[in-house]
């Protein structure tokens, strides 16, 4: 019977962490909406034969807008989302250290796991920003936060 309780606590902790990461991801998308991609011109869509000069101009304009969208707009958006979620992950991980003092182990572990899942999400989004400098900084911050958390949660606890 006691083993069933341990399994249930483990599942609850994992589920809480997963829900926190999902909450932060959806919250970020809700309050910081992604940019809208350019729409393909209808005049070019309905063409059955060769493109006219006007349609060619529309096609070139659309391709230029898509290039700007893919190379600049969405890259900046992904970097900003990564910054927001990295901050949220750090807050969750610090909160898990503070909750540890309250002796609420199952909640503390769930919050810590949520922070780690959010950190992973943040790094993945950061990599899609295609900025090596930012990716390196984000990975460094993540590493420092995880090392600090690990020390305070596991090493310092044993002393």
Protein language model annotation of sequence segments:
Residues 1-35, 143, 150-157:
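Hydrophobic secretory-pathway targeting helix
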Residues 2-5, 48-56, 102-105:
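Alpha-helix capping and helix-coil boundary motifs
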Residues 5-11, 75-78, 101-104, 108:
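Membrane-interface helix-boundary signature
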Residues 18, 85, 111-115:
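Hydrophobic alpha-helical transmembrane segments of polytopic
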Residues 31-77:
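Low-complexity, proline/glycine-enriched hydrophobic segments characteristic of transmembrane helices
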Residues 75-88:
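N-terminal membrane-entry
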Residues 92-159:
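Juxtamembrane interface at the cytosolic side of transmembrane helices
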């Amino acid at each position: 019977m006691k083993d069933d309780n341990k399994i249930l606590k483990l599942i609850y902790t994992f589920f809480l962490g997963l829900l926190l990461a999902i909450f932060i991801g959806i919250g970020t998308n809700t309050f910081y909406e992604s940019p809208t991609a350019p729409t393909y011109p209808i005049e070019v869509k309905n063409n059955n034969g060769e493109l006219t000069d006007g349609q060619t101009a529309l096609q070139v304009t659309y391709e230029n807008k898509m290039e700007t969208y893919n190379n600049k707009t969405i890259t900046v958006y992904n970097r900003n989302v990564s910054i927001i979620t990295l901050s949220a992950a750090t807050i969750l991980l610090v909160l898990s250290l503070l909750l540890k003092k309250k002796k609420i182990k199952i909640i503390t572990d769930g919050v810590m796991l949520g922070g780690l899942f959010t950190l992973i999400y943040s790094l993945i989004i950061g990599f899609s920003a295609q900025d090596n400098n930012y990716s390196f900084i984000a990975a460094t911050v993540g590493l420092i936060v995880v090392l600090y958390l690990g020390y305070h949660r596991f090493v310092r606890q044993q002393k």
